[in-house]
Structure formats: structure tokens, C-alpha cells
Amino acid sequence: MDKLLERFLNYVSLDTQSKAGVRQVPSTEGQWKLLHLLKEQLEEMGLINVTLSEKGTLMATLPANVPGDIPAIGFISHVDTSPDCSGKNVNPQIVENYRGGDIALGIGDEVLSPVMFPVLHQLLGQTLITTDGKTLLGADDKAGIAEIMTALAVLQQKNIPHGDIRVAFTPDEEVGKGAKHFDVDAFDARWAYTVDGGGVGELEFENFNAASVNIKIVGNNVHPGTAKGVMVNALSLAARIHAEVPADESPEMTEGYEGFYHLASMKGTVERADMHYIIRDFDRKQFEARKRKMMEIAKKVGKGLHPDCYIELVIEDSYYNMREKVVEHPHILDIAQQAMRDCDIEPELKPIRGGTDGAQLSFMGLPCPNLFTGGYNYHGKHEFVTLEGMEKAVQVIVRIAELTAQRKS
């Protein structure tokens, strides 16, 4: 398929890791490099209205090639890779005709094993693109970028009937800022799809409601030998707080539609401790109940403390479940499912145990479910993607454009 693998390998060669806790958007210079490269490529392909905002959102339009009042649709991917694992000097391995068993990742001890990742059993005979065991791969979401770019080329070269196709590439999705500076009005699509999913057939329109909880604990430190009745150990208070959080509602104990509390970081001394939790739940009422639970725990543990010692809790909502917005427009899912079936793929509707730019965009007036990329094991050195899965994603994008052209606004 037209330059698909070449594009992907080109994009992952650029280090575009985003960085949390940074004010500027994009948060890293590497993202600008990929955005400028993509802008140049879009212009070379002849797309119109190619714009790159000061906040790093790249937009372009492939004009309709058929007359009529056809709804404009969009496809969106993000240029950054996760801060969780290095994205510098990515050295992909190409494993053709995978025959099963362990795949050595580079020259070290790291392997990609079907024992740990049973999905490999389903991928026999396919071409796998893996890491060398030292970095992530960047299929999340450079596979999506390569697929969108290739689909644009296919639509042009084969003169497939389509309406206006908008594309956008966003920064800082992995640190939750990807959609904050997205101009929905300028994008001017009736609906869109993020291309940021996993295995072939995945179609996602439900995601977690998400919030962050930051807890500041101020204690009182004195010499341990004279501490009775005076010392207030902030670390002990932190331990008591975590002991009150339901242990069976953590990420490692939940799946499917189950929500969780996750202690993401904790640091401190006797004098001061800080805890950072994330809260996730698909159900809005349960989500609100989880936030109340954290407030109740903080009040309980902080009861009776000396006035100079205290527990401060700040809860900030991150994003909400896009289901309530997407289901108002069922044809968006119908078209995607039909496109998959037309490409001999059985759609797999499943909840996202996470979030996407599409979740925020759906609440900004742009309904935006998520399509598969063909990638697996994101955010780590065991990440990989199949070439066949990427090719299927291109076919689905093209077919969605074609099916939409058969509709009238």
C-alpha cells in the first residue's frame, strides 16, 4: 500500500515525547518537527486550507471530488508519544511472516512473548513491527498518522468519490492537552474519527469519566525522642488515607466497565507529603460517588489534627464519557461499522479504559468516536503494530469517506 510502512518508519524516527507539567503547548520541540514535516507533506499532496496554529494543531482539507451536499467529516491523530517510556532513537524491528514464539527485542534480554501477550497467537503469518527493547515504538499514534496520510493518497490516486475530508494532527494528547486548543469551528466537520485505537476491528465510543485528585498533607516534625503528643507524621497520614481507599478497586483489580482509584504517585517526609490519585469510571453517578469518597476519606483522616497541620484535597475533572454525545448521532457508528464489514472486518465495540482527544472534542460539539490502528501494548518497550492491521485501517478510512459520500446532509 502506497508508502504506508515508509511513512510510519519516518514518523517514529522523530522523538515527539510530550512532557507533563509544562505550560507551553506543544510541550516539547520534537512535536513541532513532526508537525512541520506533516504540513509540508500535506501541501505537497495538494490539500487546501493547510494551517498550523501557534498551539501546534495542524489542519488541512482534501476537497470533495463529487457534487452535492455531502457532510464534511474528519480524521484526527496525535503527534506526541507517551512520557512513560523513552521515544528517543526508536529502532524498529520488522518481523515478516511471524511464526509464533518469542521475538527477541534487540540484543538484550527483552522479548515479546505470547505467554505474556497472548494476542500474538492471533497474528501468525503477519508482519510485526516491534521495538528493540530500549524505547517505545510510537504506534500510538504515529500508526494513526501514517494511516490517515496514506488514506488521503489512496483517495486521490484512485479518484474514489468523497466529500470534503478534514484532517487534523494534534499535540500533547498523552498529557491531556491535545483538544484544549482545538478550534472546532475552524475544523468545520460534521463529525470526525480519531485514529488512535488498538487491534483490528476496535470501534470505541465509550471512555472513562476522569478526574485527578491531588492531596497535600502538612505535618509537624520534631526530634523522635521528644515526639510524643507533638509530632504529626505526614507520611503516616498518607498511609492511613491510602488504607481507606478500596483495595479491590484499583487498576490491577478491574477490567471492562469497572472503574478504579489509582495512586499514581506519593512522596514526602514527616513534615510534608503529597499524593496524586486518578479516578476513573464509565458511569457518571459512580464517578461523582468516587470523588465524594475521596473527600470523605480526607475529612476522616484529618479530623482532630492540630490547627497547624492539615490535609488539603483538590479534585479536577479531566474529561467525560463521550457516549452521551456520540449516541445522539447513531449514523456515525453505523457508517464505521459498515465500512469495517465491507473490508471483511467484524466490528468490536468496546469501552476505552482511558481517554482520547475525541472524548473532549465530542463535548466541544464534534462527535468523535475512535478507530483502530492495528497497534498493541502502547506506552512501553513491548509496543508493536502489524503492517496488515495498518493496511486494514487505511481501507476502513477510505471506505468511511466513500460511504459518507453516498449520504446527503
Curated annotation (Swiss-Prot):
Residues noted as binding Zn(2+) 2 in the record, renumbered to the chain: 140, 174, 379
Subcellular location, record wording: Cytoplasm
Active-site residues per Swiss-Prot or TrEMBL entry: 80, 173
EC number(s) from the headed UniProt entry: 3.4.11.4
Family per similarity comment: Belongs to the peptidase M20B family.
HAMAP family: Aminopeptidase_M20
Protein name as annotated: Peptidase T
Organism taxonomic ancestry: Bacteria, Pseudomonadati, Pseudomonadota, Gammaproteobacteria, Enterobacterales
